[in-house]
Amino acid sequence: MDKVLAKPADLCCLKGEIHTGEPTGSVKQIDGIDTYVAKPQPGKENGHILLFFPDAFGLHINCFLMMDAFAQCGYVTLGVDYFVGDPISKYSYNPLNDPNFDFESWKDKHLHASEEAAARWVKAVKAEYATSDTVKFAAVGYCWGARFVTHQLSAEGICQVGAIAHPSFLNESDVFGVKEPIFLSVPAKDNLFEDEQRTRTVEILTQESGRFNMQIFSNVGHGFASRGRLTDPYERWAKEQHFKSFVDWFDFWLGNK
């Protein structure tokens, strides 16, 4: 039996703050799928590619700003619209207070379709961006996107390192399949990724001799890394710390330091 580690996305995935800023990337299509492309400043490139798998809000301002920030750290960052134009942000930025939005139906529609779109997209990304043996791939995923990172860290994936924050839809098989270094950034209290399942995740990675690290923040909720309240000093700090930790993790394993 493939036991659940992180439960399916729930109402906690619909909370959080929408951030403000001016994105600097652009959108193009890769195998017919909209892709946000954030590039480093000239001369700052490290030669590697970061795949960005968003939460249920899809490609929206919070993601754009994070991808731009990853790019400023040297990574050409590619964000995938695996909801194919139908993310939650299409309907509302405050879906908890929108009586017309049916989250359960939306999840049913996109659970497997997003997996298929992501797999097709990754294959096309590799064909376009793996231009030499020196190009390496990393992956980052938030909530809905976490399991896609584990897929890309498996024997069938293309990534050499990955990181996830506050995962959902994560089963034991996803973690058993991880063969490359993985970093997890999670809240101390998360109804989707509870203490027992968090401990089990560490047990599996340890049992499999995995290269991993887990960062646990108290007093933040599910979604803090992607939709944290920037007006709250501690929550802003936690969000910034998760980002710095992810970049350091990528840099270490990809030989940028």
State what each model feature region is:
Residues 1-257:
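N-terminal cap/leader regions of alpha/beta-hydrolase-fold enzymes
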